[in-house]
Amino acid sequence: MSIQEKMANILPHTAGVNKRGHLTIGGCDAAKLAVKFDTPLYIFDEATLRGTCAEFYKEFGRRYADTLVIYAAKAFLNRALARIFKQEGLGLDVVSGGELSIARSADFPMDKVFFHGNNKLREEIELAIGWGVGRIVVDNLRELALVNQIAKKAGITQDILLRLTPGIDAHTHEYITTGVIDSKFGLPIATGQAEEALVEALSASNLRLIGLHVHLGSLIFSAEPYRKAIEIVFGFAADMRERHGFNLCEFSPGGGFAVQYTQDTPAPDIAHFAQAICGTIRSKSKEFGLKPPRLIVEPGRAIVGRAGVAIYRVGAIKDIPGVRKYIAVDGGMADNIRPALYGSKYEAIVANKVNQKLLERVNIVGKFCESGDVLVKDAEIPRVVPGDIIAIPVSGAYCLSIASNYNASLKPAIVLVKEGKALLIRRRETYDDLMQFDVD
């Protein structure tokens, strides 16, 4: 089996191998891009981005016509990607003033922006309301009062959703589990705090409560948590209708859809989640006598993960006979913290030796001053020498968005590839960039 076949489910849709035995993405030679733009380098495939956006609308839209897909910007956002999502008809889920600013700088339609977050700052809420965001997803009682106060001062009525915690364990990593009662996010249904917030929202002078939101976590491989959450939330909505006259006009089950990172961790396709979510919304709406609400779906990783590939250059090679061989590259935990933070697993490809036999099992490690700076454990690769190019697929989500300047390193450049052309969409940092905010 060729590398191309072996990696078929994790490489971008346009990936291939050229006559030189080099990995290609979007018709561009990855090794040549490493020379042109230097390394570390992140490559995003435009066709994969657009194709995945279209697939979400296709799979959810054909099962539930009143669907809006909004991209979860925390996975990674810059202006170039925001413009693509705008063109594909998506909305944006943002969680900070910074993400709001990126959206605005890309002329993203603010009425399709949903502002999330468990501790929104006053100035962030003022920006959001001033710029006309479509929805503020209220996370707690303090925020509810604050949003109403700011909306009143601005002389508007702000549409809001309430974020609820349904008390469901999505069985993912504890750091990315968000739907349980013991969570910093949301208003628990079981404790009565969700009802308290709902009553307060309905009586607020400058708020319009139009829906409910849940988010269960990230990297969820089963549709069952979504089914359970919908049943709980729709039951709550029906109860609130009877007790307080609340009408559920919009509902979001969040995102968190898993993607495949390695050959031994297959993930369900989009259709699997769409069928479960849309079917359950229909059945539970009927069961509880609710008018089917508008569906808001919030994929992040599931849109950008596979579209991104990280490119590194091999430097030092350390072979400890009978123990292990280490291949050090010029990036690592500063641009991809996920292996160190979550124990995340990746595959690796030697981009300039794709067709060569896999002769070695090695650890691919970064250049940073931590023993935990390991990008790929037990990677099966051809024999490499300094200067070879390592590609790590499925690097589009939660790598660059969590990147740091650890060890005063420089954040990498990013290119967008399409039909043999590579567009620089973020330049590499310089040493002057590192010091630009220092005050002597």
Describe these PLM feature segments.
Residues 1-159, 195, 203-208, 419-440:
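A charged N-terminal "starter" segment
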Residues 2-5, 167-316, 381, 407, ...:
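Active-site loop/helix belt of alpha/beta enzymes
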Residues 15-17, 23, 185, 364, ...:
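Short clusters of hydrophobic/aromatic residues that line enzyme substrate/ligand-binding pockets
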Residues 34, 276, 282-285, 290-440:
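Charged (often Lys/Glu-rich) extended helix/loop segments that serve as interaction or gating elements
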Residues 50-53, 230, 274, 391:
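Hydrophobic face of alpha-helices
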Residues 68-70, 89-91, 110-114, 135, ...:
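Structural preference for beta-strand elements that scaffold enzyme active sites
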Residues 75-77, 98-99, 119-121, 140-142, ...:
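Active-site-proximal loop/turn and secondary-structure-junction residues that shape catalytic pockets
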